[in-house]
């Protein structure tokens, strides 16, 4: 299944998790989880997928970067990964900002 569709399904089902850093960035940018959900659902493409290494486990992972507006038209940048939590696919957000470049 297409990765963007999987991410959108997680957003629609409320299966989004945020790191503490992402929560802080949301607060600084005066955004909330609804803005992120709207941005992910509105996305037409994944801007970039990068390979990374998890600093805690050392395992390789794919991080998906999405740049898309929410329903108010605010351009939002997100970086996250799809993970399985208790047998359910969840989108784990590492970074979130309304500053798209």
Question: What name fits each language-model region?
Answer:
Residues 1-101:
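Ribonuclease/tRNase effector modules and their secretory precursors
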């Amino acid at each position: 299944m297409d990765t963007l569709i999987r991410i959108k399904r997680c957003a629609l089902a409320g299966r989004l998790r945020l790191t503490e850093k992402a929560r802080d960035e949301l607060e600084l940018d005066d955004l909330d989880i609804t803005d992120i959900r709207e941005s992910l659902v509105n996305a037409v493409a994944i801007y970039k997928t990068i390979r990374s290494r998890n600093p805690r486990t050392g395992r390789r992972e794919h991080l998906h970067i999405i740049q898309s507006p929410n329903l108010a038209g605010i351009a939002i940048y997100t970086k996250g990964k799809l993970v399985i939590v208790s047998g359910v696919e969840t989108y784990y957000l590492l970074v979130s900002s309304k500053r798209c470049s």
